[in-house]
Amino acid sequence: MENTRKIVTFGEIMLRLTPPANRRFDQSPVYEVTFGGSEANVAVSLANYGVRSEFVTCLPANKIATAAVEDLRRNGVETGRIVRGGDRMGLYYMEKAASIRSSQVVYDRAGSSFDALRPGMIDWEETFRDAGWFHWSGIAAAVSADTAEVCAEAIGAARRLGLTVSCDINYRKNLWRYGKTAREVLVPMMGECDVLFGTDDEYATVAGIGVPTLKNREASDKLDPADYEAAARETAARFPNCRMAVFALRNVLNANHHTVSGTLSTEGRLLTTRVYEIEPVVDCVGVGDAFVGGIIYSLHAGRTPQQALDFGAAACALKNTVPGDYNRMTVEEVDALVGGSASGRIAR
């Protein structure tokens, strides 16, 4: 039977400004403008796959914010619970990487409408009325002490109502500026989650769990499950409510050449998937969100954990080929890659 319950994501959507043609910030008289943000990116992925998804945030009552809302709606995301308030929308500037030059990101989000969000401003009981899953990330909790409280408020309501709760650790060191560490804030909330997502660095930095890094240089290399079993056991012991822990693995050989893979631990089993090699990388922003969205979609649709991991890794790999924050791949396209279609030939 089809799962018709919606998936709710919560976080900040921002205006992204990018110099075209791999230019540096000081080289370009014009910037390409798009919208994005981790939790919004996940909502768009889910909508692309035909799942009811709703994005909850706080935005100012101005035309730029309205354009962001309309962009979400065009991509199939429900927006009826977005709160309007505050004075400005958060921005971020993205200088794209090239070869041995790394990407650069400059945030301009202090004092944004999302920053002004306070507990009690969102009716979570009503928001979750016909929902089956709630997804949040560490970015939302990093913006301010108040937004962290709103995250905790939402998690509590979701658990009371029996929703599946997932968290992407999404550690951003430059955002944690309000006097508490990510570990202090996130670990208690992670303990209330059913599904955890994160990279090797994020599990180590935030939860103190050592996860081996991806060393693969070739797509033909395979992951050794034994390398990740200790981390899986430690995560299960540290977070007993967690039914599933997902490790996103990426090796950046240079800005244009990445390998991606992942592992998933559940019920004492550790699952691995193939390693994907991406060269050239078109845009690496949002690839982790594509991974998360692919796995949530698969589990929501009743696929097995192994199928979910395979689908998520393939979605992550494909997002590297798409400009912008959003993953615009279809279920059929992702499934085709899982099935071995990676030639890049014209589909006629």
Ranges and model annotations:
Residues R24-V42:
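Short catalytic helix/loop segments, enriched in acidic residues and glycine
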Residues L175-R269:
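Conserved phosphate/ATP/ADP-binding segment of small-molecule kinases
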Residues M1-R24:
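Positively charged, low-complexity intrinsically disordered leader regions
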Residues A157-T164, F239-R243:
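A short helix->loop->beta-strand "cap" motif at the edges of active sites that frequently abuts
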Residues A255, L270-S341:
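Conserved post-catalytic alpha-helical subdomain immediately downstream of the catalytic base
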Residues R52-I139, V334-R348:
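Conserved N-terminal subdomain of the carbohydrate kinase-like
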Residues S53, T79, V165-S166, F197:
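Hydrophobic beta-strand scaffold residues
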Residues R24, N41-R52, S298-A301:
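Alpha-helix C-terminal capping segments
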